[in-house]
Structures are given as C-alpha cells and as structure tokens.
C-alpha cells in the first residue's frame, strides 16, 4: 500500500465550479452529526472512481455524495448510471446541477442509506462506490454483505483501522468478527491511504480506500446467521479458549471436535474456513 496522499489541488473537468465554490454557494458546511468530511481533490476522487472497474455497465450506487466531488468523478469516468443516496437536504441543489450536466445519468434519493434496500436499486451489475460517513460505515457494510450476491464490487473509504480489520489475517490483533464475515463472502484488497488534510474538515485519523469483491460462492459452506452467532460468541471472549467461549452454543468441545478444531485454541487463531466448519457443526447439532 502506498503512503498517505497529501493533495489539495482541485481540477474539475466538467464545466462545473470548483468544490470550494460549490460549498460556499450552497452553504454546505460539513456537519459532524451527519459524519460529513468532504473531499476537495478531484484527482483523488477520480482515482476512487477508476477503482470501480467497468462502471459504464450496470449501476453505481454512491452513499453520502455531499457536494458531489465523487459523483462528478464517477460520471466523468463514464458511469452509465449513478444513484446517489443523500440524507442532507442542503445537497439537493448542487446534485441537481450535476444531473443537469449529465442528463439521464444521475438519480438522487433523499434519505438514510440504512433504511434503503440498496441491493434492489438499479440494474445489475451493481457497484457501491462511496466515501462513507464514518459514523454508519460498518453497519452499512454488514447490511450489504447479507446480500453480497446482489453486488459486483464495493469501493469504499473507511477509517484505516476499519480496513485493517476487514483485511486482517488470523493470529493478528485486528482479526475479528468483521474480518471473518467479510472474507468469507468477499475478497478484500486495501488500495491506498488518504491523508486527513485531503478532507474538509480534516478527520483525526488516516482513511483508507478498499476494494471488496463478492465471491461467486462463500469461501466455505455455512449459514450466515449461524456464522454471525458463532463469531459473536467466539470473539466476545476472544482471550478465552474455544471450549469456554462457545459454551453458550452448547457442547463446546463436541462442536470443536465436529469442526476439526482444537478446543484450547482462541478465536483470533481460527481461519475463516474453521469458523465456517464450526457454524456447520452448530447447525448439525441444532445448537442455535
């Protein structure tokens, strides 16, 4: 992964005003309550857009477009159709201006993405490409993963620590429930870091853009509901051995034996396939 990017140039190429001017004209001061941190650098947003792959097909879904920096980059990069979900009504005007420049290619939905069935929006293949509001980023991703087969790709910006957890390997401090569930369903590839100074206001942490590609099939057979319960039990007491942390699920040692796992192992050492085997054992035993 490259070092954090520290960029400030704004290079719009669509005839629309620079983002600083847009924000001033529309009174779009970033609001902490909405988790807003605006990206001004259109070179950077262009890089995010290009990571989406063949966006000239299907539908691109953007969450929290704000003043439209990434929206403009997506359309400029050839996105056939962009559906932008924005709960801040102040952004209505600027998004309408962008839509006028790209007629028929931008649809705006005013609302909370947590309440919207994103997996049913637009035509496949669906790609979610977004600088997510950090206060809802993880719940959004977990909700989408429950319908992972509806999506072709996610290109998302999170706090770096979240991406570290998404991509973590067994035996590392960042490995946990989020790592297991995400990697069971998807291939995870961190792309690049973004310096806080690229945002207004600058967040207190480095951000990371990550590409998440849903697998044609999960890494190993299991029911997601059971896998979620198993990982919740195991990582809820991550320093305990499995024979202790899994007691709430039934005969912990018997479940470990059925899954081919050492009952004295700890959750942080178990690979994704091991948790899938444990979920199958739980279902077979009728423990959940």
Curated annotation (Swiss-Prot):
The keyword Transferase applies. SMART domains: rADc. S-adenosyl-L-methionine binds at residues 37, 39, 64, 86, 112, 131. One of its GO terms (cellular component) is cytosol. It comes from the Bacteria. Keywords: Cytoplasm, Methyltransferase, RNA-binding, rRNA processing, S-adenosyl-L-methionine, Transferase. Its EC number is 2.1.1.182. Its main location: cytoplasm. Pfam families: RrnaAD (PF00398). SUPFAM superfamilies: S-adenosyl-L-methionine-dependent methyltransferases (SSF53335). It is found in: Cytoplasm. It catalyses: adenosine(1518)/adenosine(1519) in 16S rRNA + 4 S-adenosyl-L-methionine = N(6)-dimethyladenosine(1518)/N(6)-dimethyladenosine(1519) in 16S rRNA + 4 S-adenosyl-L-homocysteine + 4 H(+). PANTHER family: DIMETHYLADENOSINE TRANSFERASE, DIMETHYLADENOSINE TRANSFERASE-RELATED. Belongs to the class I-like SAM-binding methyltransferase superfamily. rRNA adenine N(6)-methyltransferase family. RsmA subfamily. Specifically dimethylates two adjacent adenosines (A1518 and A1519) in the loop of a conserved hairpin near the 3'-end of 16S rRNA in the 30S particle. May play a critical role in biogenesis of 30S subunits. HAMAP family: 16SrRNA_methyltr_A. This is Ribosomal RNA small subunit methyltransferase A. It comes from Rhodospirillum rubrum (strain ATCC 11170 / ATH 1.1.1 / DSM 467 / LMG 4362 / NCIMB 8255 / S1).
């Amino acid at each position: 992964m490259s070092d954090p990017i520290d960029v400030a140039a704004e290079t719009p190429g669509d005839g629309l005003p620079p983002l600083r001017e847009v924000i001033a004209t529309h009174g779009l001061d970033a609001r902490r309550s909405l988790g807003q941190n605006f990206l001004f650098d259109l070179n950077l947003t262009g890089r995010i857009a290009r990571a989406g792959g063949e966006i000239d097909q299907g539908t691109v879904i953007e969450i929290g477009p704000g003043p439209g920096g990434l929206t403009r980059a997506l359309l400029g990069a050839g996105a056939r159709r962009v559906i932008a979900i924005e709960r801040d009504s102040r952004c209505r005007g600027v998004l309408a201006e962008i839509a006028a420049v790209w007629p028929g290619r931008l649809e705006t939905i005013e609302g909370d993405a947590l309440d919207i069935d994103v997996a049913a929006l637009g035509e496949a293949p669906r790609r979610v490409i977004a600088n997510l509001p950090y206060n809802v980023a993880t719940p959004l991703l977990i909700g989408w993963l429950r319908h992972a087969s509806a999506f072709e790709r996610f290109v998302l910006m999170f706090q770096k620590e979240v991406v570290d957890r998404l991509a973590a390997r067994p035996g590392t401090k960042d490995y946990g429930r989020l790592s297991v569930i995400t990697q069971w369903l998807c291939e995870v590839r961190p792309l690049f870091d973004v310096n806080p100074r690229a945002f207004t206001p600058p967040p207190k942490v480095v951000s990371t853009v990550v590409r998440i590609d849903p697998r044609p099939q999960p890494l190993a057979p299991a029911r997601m509901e059971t896998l979620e319960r198993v990982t919740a039990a195991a990582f809820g007491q991550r320093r305990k051995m499995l024979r202790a942390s899994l007691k709430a699920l039934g005969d912990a040692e018997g479940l470990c034996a059925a899954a081919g796992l050492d009952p004295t192992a700890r959750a942080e050492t178990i690979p994704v396939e091991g948790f899938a085997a444990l979920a199958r054992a739980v279902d077979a035993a009728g423990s959940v």
